[in-house]
């Protein structure tokens, strides 16, 4: 038997497809989402409908974003859900969730998007960064992710898991782990453990920055060289005297600073941009 084939569909490696089939896990995730009629729910990567069906049972409409042409077509012809489903066949990484919010006139209805999904593990981190651009249009997010990614999302300073993903996510959202999921809950079974996480965007940002570019810049530069002291890692942005004036320990490393610390550095850079730093240069994602 082909271990990658499930319900007549063969999982495609290039899409990072692993299909959820454990009923207990599915029930646990749906209970965590707690879908209600009248809400605007969006599922990313519905696949074969393991979450789609029980969520749609509890609501009157559901928008799904699916890249796989065959799966999108399958959902359009779902035997009993097709009238509830709005199937958008596109790459979620390129999708404008803000436009969806506007097109559905959710502001006038006093609503926001509720986003959930079993995210392809090969794009989960950049997809989360993409979704954070629309944090003010989103009520909450529930995602199945690689367990190690959930640990990073939930991490605290002074830990190995703490990194740029932690800071940028917690800058925008409250992060809560929901449940852990074994590989046997999927077909084909992934080689890693999984977990479900809940992200609730802050109604008011606890540590607002004047220019998000500088928060991206300073966190990227710090964590791309996380083994170095901040005195060295941030030497192109700050002098030692400037860091000291900002209450930063020169011997500290990237994981030792809180989100509030990074926000303070970003706001200083917004007011005092280094003359030799080009805003258009690409910030490489390469945490050590």
Curated annotation (Swiss-Prot):
It is found in: Cytoplasm. Its main location: cytoplasm. It catalyses: adenosine(1518)/adenosine(1519) in 16S rRNA + 4 S-adenosyl-L-methionine = N(6)-dimethyladenosine(1518)/N(6)-dimethyladenosine(1519) in 16S rRNA + 4 S-adenosyl-L-homocysteine + 4 H(+). GO terms for cellular component: cytosol. The keyword rRNA processing applies. GO terms for molecular function: 16S rRNA (adenine(1518)-N(6)/adenine(1519)-N(6))-dimethyltransferase activity; RNA binding. It is an enzyme of class 2 (transferase). Keywords: Cytoplasm, Methyltransferase, RNA-binding, rRNA processing, S-adenosyl-L-methionine, Transferase. S-adenosyl-L-methionine binds at residues 18, 20, 45, 66, 91, 118. Pfam families: RrnaAD. It comes from the Bacteria. Specifically dimethylates two adjacent adenosines (A1518 and A1519) in the loop of a conserved hairpin near the 3'-end of 16S rRNA in the 30S particle. May play a critical role in biogenesis of 30S subunits. Belongs to the class I-like SAM-binding methyltransferase superfamily. rRNA adenine N(6)-methyltransferase family. RsmA subfamily. This is Ribosomal RNA small subunit methyltransferase A. It comes from Mannheimia succiniciproducens (strain KCTC 0769BP / MBEL55E). The lineage of its organism: Bacteria, Pseudomonadati, Pseudomonadota, Gammaproteobacteria, Pasteurellales.
């Amino acid at each position: 038997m082909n271990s990658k084939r499930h319900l007549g569909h063969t999982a495609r490696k290039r899409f990072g497809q692993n299909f959820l089939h454990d009923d207990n896990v599915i029930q646990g995730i749906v209970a965590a989402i707690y879908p209600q009629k009248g809400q605007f729910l969006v599922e990313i990567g519905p696949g074969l409908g393991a979450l789609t069906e029980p969520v749609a049972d509890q609501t009157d409409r559901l928008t799904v974003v699916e890249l796989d042409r065959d799966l999108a077509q399958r959902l359009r012809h779902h035997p009993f859900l097709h009238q509830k489903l709005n199937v958008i066949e596109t790459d979620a990484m390129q999708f404008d969730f803000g436009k969806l919010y506007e097109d559905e006139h959710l502001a006038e209805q006093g609503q926001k998007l509720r986003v959930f999904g079993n995210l392809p593990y090969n794009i989960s981190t950049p997809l989360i960064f993409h979704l954070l651009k629309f944090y003010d249009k989103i009520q909450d997010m529930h995602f199945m992710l690689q367990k190690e990614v959930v640990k990073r999302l939930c991490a605290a300073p002074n830990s190995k898991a703490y990194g740029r993903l932690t800071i940028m996510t917690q800058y925008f959202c409250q992060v809560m782990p929901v449940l852990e999921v074994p590989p046997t809950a999927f077909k084909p079974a992934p080689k890693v453990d999984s977990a479900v996480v809940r992200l609730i965007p802050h109604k008011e940002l606890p540590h607002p920055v004047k220019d998000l570019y500088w928060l991206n810049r300073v966190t990227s530069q710090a964590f791309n060289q996380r083994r170095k002291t901040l005195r060295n890692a941030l030497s192109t942005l700050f002098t030692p005297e400037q860091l000291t004036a900002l209450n930063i320990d020169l011997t500290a490393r990237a994981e030792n600073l809180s989100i509030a610390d990074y926000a303070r550095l970003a706001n200083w850079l917004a007011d005092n941009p280094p003359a030799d730093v080009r805003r258009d240069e690409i910030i490489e994602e390469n945490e050590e």
